Each structure stands twice: as C-alpha cells, then as structure tokens.
Regions:
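Extreme N-terminal starter segment of soluble prokaryotic enzymes
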Residues: 1-5
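Active-site and donor-binding regions of nucleotide-sugar-utilizing enzymes
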Residues: 7, 11-16, 21-28, 39-131, ...
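Short helix-loop-beta junction
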Residues: 31-32
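Conserved beta-strand positions in the Rossmann-like core of class I SAM-dependent methyltransferases
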Residues: 36
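A nucleotide-sugar donor-handling region in carbohydrate enzymes
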Residues: 113-167
Length: 167
C-alpha cells in the first residue's frame, strides 16, 4: 500500500486548523493508503484524535525538520500544512524523491510541490509555483471532517422565518 506522511503542528494557542484539516485528509485516505501523521509535541487531544485515524510519530521541536526528513525513503507522498514550511524545506522533501502536497491559505512563498490545495476562492495567478505544480483551488477542495461531510445528507425542514431581531 502506498504511504502518505502528513506533517502539521498545533499548540494550545495556534495551528489547530492546520492539524484538524490535515487529519481530516488522513481520515479520508486511510482506507486506501498507509497513513502516518507527524507532529511536534502533540497535546492529549491531538493524540486522541490521531489514534482514531492513523499511527503518529511525535517530533521534537528543536530537531523536527531534520528528524522528519530522516523518515523519508523517497516513495512516500508527503502532505505539509503549516505556515513555517519554507520553499527550501519543500525542496529537501522533493530531493528525497517524494511526491509533495502543500495545503496553503496564504500563497506567500514559492511552491515546488506537485499539488497545492487552497479551499478558498483564490486566483491561481497569486501563486508562485513550478510549471508542473497542480493547483486545487476553491470550495470543492475543502478538507472537512466526516461529520461535516455528512451534513448535506441530513434532511432539513424549510421553516419560514416570520420574525427576527437584529442587534
């Protein structure tokens, strides 16, 4: 089975969106791929959530970049989601022979990734990419957890709102 390594960090104060959407993608793909999640200093909540989806490997803050690269054999797909992963770091992953997917909502750096996912309504011309980079832009690419993916299947009664107070 093909391997996918997911790399995202979060703390008690920042980054949970990156962690949650990347874990949502792992959950979508876990039946068809051998998924492993890599993160720095996971909280007990993160550990609990990752254990529901796939194996995980905690990384040390001081050496996380080099440590993650040391796991790569070159046959993996790597998914990065963090503002701090630079173009040089992307290049290091690509030089290992891996396919690379970057989840982005800033478009503030050059991408050497094979695929860039941005679920916002974004102009592709705002991205600096390699000629081979495929851009996956717009709501169709939103990485949602299973409960939110199932919402459209729930029957709703249309109720007419007759009175409303706006403050």
């Amino acid at each position: 089975m093909r391997k996918i390594y997911f790399r995202a960090d979060a703390s008690a104060t920042i980054g949970y969106g990156h962690f949650i959407r990347t874990l949502a993608l792992a959950d979508m793909l876990k039946d068809d791929f051998d998924c492993t999640f890599f993160t720095c200093h996971p909280t007990s909540y993160q550990v609990e959530e990752m254990e529901k989806v796939c194996p995980f490997i905690p990384l040390q803050e001081e050496t996380h970049s080099a440590d993650f690269l040391s796991y790569l054999q070159g046959d993996e797909i790597v998914v990065l989601d963090n503002y701090f992963f630079t173009t040089d770091y992307q290049r290091a992953i690509k030089q290992k022979g891996c396919r690379l997917v970057c989840i982005d909502d800033m478009h503030d750096k050059h991408y050497v990734a094979d695929v860039v996912i941005n679920h916002g309504i974004t102009n592709g011309n705002l991205f600096s990419t390699e000629p081979y980079t495929q851009l996956c832009l717009g709501y169709a690419w939103a990485l949602l957890r299973l409960p939110f993916l199932q919402l459209p299947q729930i029957q709703r009664k249309n109720r007419k709102i007759e009175k409303a107070i706006v403050c």
